[in-house]
Amino acid sequence: MSSPVVTRFAPSPTGFLHIGGARTALFNWLYARRFGGRMLLRIEDTDRERSTQGAIDAILDGMRWLGLDWDGEVIYQFARAERHREVAESLLASGNAYHCYASAEELAQMRETARAEGRAPRYDGRWRDRDPSEAPEGVKPVIRLRAPSEGETVVEDAVQGRVTWANRDLDDLVLLRSDGTPTYMLAVVVDDHDMGVTQVIRGDDHLTNAARQSQIYRALGWDVPAMAHIPLIHGADGAKLSKRHGALGVEEYRDRGYLPAALRNYLVRLGWSHGDQEVFSTEEMIAAFDLKAIGRSAARFDFTKLESLNGLYIRGSADSVLVDAIDAILPARGPERGLPTALTPDLREKLVSAMPGLKERAKTLVELLDSAYYLYAPRPLALDAKAEALLAGDAPERLRALLPALEALPDWNAATTEAAVRQFADSQGVKLGQVAQPLRAALTGRATSPPVFDVLAVLGRDEALARLRDRLPA
């Protein structure tokens, strides 16, 4: 009987959860859920100078926002250093590792010689078979793996296929530094083994690490987990992903108004495909996810596609859900718009009422918030240039003439206000747009908005009439 599937996401807390890390987490999560397994979360915080609590918090918050839950407690690699040392000592005792006393100067000379000879730098194994009695006094050694020097190391990768390295090109890597701290290579192997990881899914920049880690596994007599090294993400221009392309923290996507479901959907299609299907519910993703369907070429990040997909998710979301999502980004986006960091009950009610008309065009929650400007703008409304143009000439006098027809309405809703405005336009012998366009400008301060009669209904009688009076000449 095969072992239950266990995957892991293992970020280093030296910065935010970037988009590549988020996709790796998603792929691990989907694979575990697809096979009824577990996804574990390990924080690789052994770089004490660069690891920060703020980065750890950002990673955890980013994963929660994306809806990627992990199983069990978060595992911190640094806290397991004693276990890593114990394993290094066991390799020493079994003869699969040895003490190396090479000085920094000797190692630098090895690198210099390799460069001069046009080959990759590698440790030359000078302490591999030397008698420990030759060790220089007062020098603390490192512990190196006694790696195989002949033959090949092979990784059967679910994405990259069969990958082979000549062992002569893989030197005896350091397992334990002279100060007793474990290296990344050792810590990853020990942690993955102790956590019961059966499937490693990570970026293909770790492919060479897979060969070295396989050697450590075999030296310990442990099973090597299955491997899948996924292609990196590039910008739309094919260059390595940078901040200008979208290499931002997940929290930045949240604050820019992307929905977590839309970002999940976009990320799953970066490098993975299922026929020509573009839109996936979470359940569909889980059911369809297959490592064999991941391509080897770098995926290209395209903001236009992400925005289009986000707009699709906005249009398909319940109005109250969108208002809650807007509320969540107000701490980041509210103050610059003169809004509080949380919705008032009155504004929440107006947003829910206006949402059917607002969400049809918006591609992000920020666009949605800006298109709702008329709901929260203080009076008298600041007009944009196009609105000013619509309210020039005889437009104010036309609005003055319209006002009594609106004031006389016994019931105030989209249908009654539309009927009144249409009747007024007919009585004046003008087209509806000649009334509706300046009316929209006066009510919203903009030339574009949701349907103007919906705007009248959402604002309510008192606010709508007050805004019209603001635009009448004295």
Curated annotation (Swiss-Prot):
Keyword Lipoprotein assigned: no
Keywords assigned: Aminoacyl-tRNA synthetase, ATP-binding, Cytoplasm, Ligase, Nucleotide-binding, Protein biosynthesis
Major location category of this protein: cytoplasm
This protein's GO CC annotations: cytosol
Reaction it catalyzes: tRNA(Glu) + L-glutamate + ATP = L-glutamyl-tRNA(Glu) + AMP + diphosphate
Name of the protein this chain belongs to: Glutamate--tRNA ligase 1
Gene from which the chain derives: gltX1
Cross-referenced InterPro entries: aa-tRNA-synth_I_cd-bd, aa-tRNA-synth_I_codon-bd_sub2, aa-tRNA-synth_I_CS, aa_tRNA-synth_I_cd-bd_sf, Glu-tRNA-ligase_bac/mito, Glu/Gln-tRNA-synth, Glu/Gln-tRNA-synth_Ib_cat-dom, GluQ/Sye
Motif ('HIGH' region): 11-21
Subunit (UniProt): Monomer.
Compartment(s) of residence: Cytoplasm
BP-aspect Gene Ontology terms: glutamyl-tRNA aminoacylation
Keyword Transmembrane helix appears in the UniProt entry: no
Positions bound to ATP: 243
Compositional bias of kind Basic and acidic residues: 113-133
EC class: ligase
One MF annotation (Gene Ontology) recorded for this entry: zinc ion binding
Motif 'KMSKS' region, chain ranges: 240-244
Record's function text: Catalyzes the attachment of glutamate to tRNA(Glu) in a two-step reaction: glutamate is first activated by ATP to form Glu-AMP and then transferred to the acceptor end of tRNA(Glu).
EC number: 6.1.1.17
Pfam family, one: tRNA-synt_1c
Family the entry assigns: Belongs to the class-I aminoacyl-tRNA synthetase family. Glutamate--tRNA ligase type 1 subfamily.
Region (Disordered): 113-136
Organism, scientific name: Methylorubrum extorquens (strain PA1) (Methylobacterium extorquens)
